[in-house]
């Protein structure tokens, strides 16, 4: 065979691989999207019901407790939803190392769960709303424990995303059905958290048993657990700090003002975060492949980064514009009478969608796969602190709009900072291109 024939053969093989790879990526993203939409739409059907049954004050109390629970989830996950996925994506062909990672991550998560117990006790002592409504705190903690121990990272790292995604969606469906059956009056709000905690517990128990059926079972170890916590600490700082301007906004707002204001802001934020979460399946489909390619094929990883910007960035701009224009209709349908003041809050928060879309591309799909956790985490810590400071300055005067302004400022700081970091590392924004000499930075 001549050299030109060899070149043509190699080119044909590369094209064939590229088509198969893109087909698999598209298939994973599509399946994840279906599962995610199922898991999102069904509980989202409960929002109009809960907003009306619980009224703004009761709905605000529920969102306050959910917000605290979701922040506890970040503590228990300790960044392993990203660092664990990244590690598994790189060693998935090595059964021995895979078993060691599973053993280490599970040990670390159990330790992190134990750390949340004093945090929860402190919240009960220090927060009047929790002292007056202990059932909300208890079930919020139990939900966090179940969700935080999820072994999704193991399956996602091997690009086996579909079954776990549908299992979680199924748990949400069951919880949503329970809401319609068991939540009838404003005092029943805690039952929403209880149903979510029980549904998630069943799903996570099944997935954990599935994971351990594929790897050797090893008893959790304090020493190994602390070692894994140390290895994932930089991503945990990023995750925990980002929670201060993502998951914990309703909780922060509830510390400053009354539950009714939390209900107005939280209702608008729930709508906009629901839209933003539709970007998650795409990000989950790209992340393990980009992490794998960043080590083995940087050229392919660069192409994937551009592809993720087109899809994630493009969709986020469309969704942001749509949510701004449709805000009055969305509030009327999803929240109902008594929530009219949430319309301008929702319109302001619609700016978050494209900001977070761009930030996701340069943060999750570039900074983490290439090992830039430290500068990324630094930006997120700064944004989390800024969000808290602005919240305490703006909320007493502007209420929910003050909280919205605080969140937007924090998210914009992260997105702009990541773009600057990308340029400083030799990247190009147009056309999007990573530095040709860029290497992986391990921490």
Protein language model annotation of sequence segments:
Residues 2-25, 189-190, 205-246, 285, ...:
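Interhelical loop/hinge segments that connect adjacent transmembrane helices in multipass membrane
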Residues 3, 23-81, 176, 233-260, ...:
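Signature of the first transmembrane helix
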Residues 23, 27-43, 65, 69, ...:
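Membrane-water interface segments that mark the loop-to-transmembrane alpha-helix transition
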Residues 27-44, 164, 170-175, 192-207, ...:
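Transmembrane helical elements of multi-pass membrane transporters/channels
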Residues 77-93, 106, 268, 272-296, ...:
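Helix-loop junctions and terminal segments of transmembrane helices
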Residues 124-140, 325-355:
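Interfacial segments at transmembrane-helix termini and the short loops linking adjacent helices
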Residues 134, 144-167, 353-380:
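Membrane-interface junctions at transmembrane-helix termini in multi-pass inner-membrane proteins
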Residues 134-144, 165-213, 382-386, 400-424:
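Hydrophobic alpha-helical transmembrane segments
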